[in-house]
C-alpha cells in the first residue's frame, strides 16, 4: 500500500467510513480501467458507504430485537395454510400499521404459524429500521415483576415504551397472577394509539378471563388490544405438522 493510500485509509478510519476505507483502492482501479469520471467514482464510493451503513443498521436492529429465530415471511408456506390471508400479512409487512400504531393479533391453536408470522413481521419492521423487541408473555411479566421488586419499574416501563414495535408471544398459555396481569396491562395501555404491538395467543377472546382473572382488567386489556386491531386467525390445524408431512411426501 502506498503512503497516499495508507493516509486515505487512516482518514477513513478516523471518520468511521468503513466501506470507503476498504473499497476506495479497488474502485479507483476499476474507475481507471473503465475511464469513469471523478464524480462517478465518488458516487460509487458514497453509495457503497450508504448501503453498508444501512446493512449494519438492520443487522443491529435484528440483534437487538431478540428474535427466537430468523424466520421471514418469505419462508412461510401460505399454500399449507390457505385460510391465513397472505395478502393481509404481506400488506402488514409494508409497515402501515406501525405508522398508525395499530395492534396485530394472531389467534390460533399451537403450531398454526403464529410465532413464525409474528417473527416475519418483526423482521420486516427491522428492515424498515424500526426498533423492535420480541418477548414471550411469561418473560415480559417476569421482567416487570422483578423490576417492581427492585424498584426499577418506572425505568423498565420507559424502556419498553421507547420501542416502536413489541411482539408479545404465547399470551394465554398460563394464567397470570393479578399483580403480573396489572403490570402487563401497563405496558399494553402505554402503547395504545402511540406504538404498535403484535400479540400471539392460543385463546379466543372469550377465554381470556382464564389469563386475566380480574374481569375489569380483562375487559380493559381487550379494549386496548382490539381497538383498530388487525386480527388474524391462524386456525386449529398445525402448520408445522402439515409442512413436515408435505416434505416427507416429496422425499
Task: Go through the PLM ranges and name each one.
Residues 1-10, 247-251:
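Intrinsically disordered, low-complexity and often Lys/Arg-enriched segments
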Residues 6, 10-13, 22-25, 40-44, ...:
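Solvent-exposed alpha-helical segments within well-ordered globular domains of core cellular machineries
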Residues 9, 17-69:
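Interdomain "pre-motor" coupling segment immediately N-terminal to P-loop NTPase/helicase cores
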Residues 17, 29-32, 47-51, 81, ...:
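Non-catalytic alpha-helical coupling and interface elements of nucleotide-dependent molecular machines
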Residues 52, 57-91, 99:
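Clamp-loader machinery-focused feature within the broader ASCE/P-loop NTPase space
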Residues 84-162, 211:
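Conserved P-loop
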Amino acid at each position: 500500500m502506498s503512503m497516499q493510500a495508507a493516509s486515505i485509509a487512516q482518514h477513513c478510519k478516523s471518520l468511521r467510513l468503513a466501506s470507503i476505507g476498504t473499497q476506495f483502492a479497488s474502485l479507483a482501479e476499476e474507475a481507471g480501467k473503465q475511464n469513469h469520471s471523478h464524480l462517478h467514482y465518488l458516487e460509487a464510493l458514497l453509495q457503497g458507504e450508504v448501503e453498508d451503513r444501512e446493512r449494519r443498521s438492520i443487522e443491529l436492529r435484528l440483534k437487538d430485537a431478540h428474535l427466537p429465530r430468523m424466520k421471514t415471511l418469505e419462508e412461510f408456506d401460505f399454500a399449507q395454510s390457505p385460510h391465513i390471508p397472505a395478502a393481509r400479512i404481506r400488506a402488514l409487512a409494508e409497515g402501515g400499521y406501525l405508522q398508525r400504531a395499530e395492534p396485530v393479533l394472531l389467534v390460533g391453536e399451537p403450531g398454526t404459524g403464529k410465532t413464525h408470522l409474528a417473527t416475519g413481521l418483526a423482521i420486516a419492521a427491522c428492515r424498515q429500521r424500526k426498533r423492535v423487541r420480541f418477548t414471550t408473555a411469561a418473560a415480559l411479566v417476569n421482567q416487570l415483576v422483578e423490576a417492581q421488586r427492585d424498584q426499577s419499574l418506572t425505568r423498565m416501563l420507559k424502556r419498553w415504551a421507547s420501542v416502536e414495535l413489541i411482539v408479545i408471544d404465547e399470551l394465554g398459555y398460563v394464567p397470570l397472577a393479578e399483580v403480573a396481569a396489572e403490570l402487563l396491562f401497563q405496558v399494553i395501555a402505554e402503547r395504545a394509539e402511540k406504538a404498535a404491538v403484535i400479540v400471539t395467543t392460543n385463546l379466543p377472546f372469550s377465554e381470556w378471563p382464564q389469563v386475566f382473572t380480574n374481569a375489569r382488567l380483562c375487559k380493559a386489556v381487550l379494549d386496548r388490544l382490539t381497538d383498530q386491531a388487525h386480527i388474524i386467525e391462524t386456525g386449529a390445524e398445525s402448520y408445522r405438522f402439515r409442512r413436515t408431512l408435505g416434505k416427507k411426501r416429496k422425499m
